[in-house]
């Protein structure tokens, strides 16, 4: 079973030592709003690209960690 975009974001946040609040601040949105988007897996492609940039990942249709090359 593959992970949702929201689940992938949570995995990468953990590996980056970041919190949801950190990501919300860096993407200029409230933590509750971002939390809702993650739980509902409701993102636009533009939002996913911005999140990937903040997390130092490449966004294709998957997340790929730039430093390890691991696809999540």
Residue ranges and their predicted role:
Residues 1-22:
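A short, Lys/Arg-rich alpha-helix, primarily the initiator
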Residues 56-72:
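Short C-terminal boundary/hinge segments that cap the last helix of small helical domains
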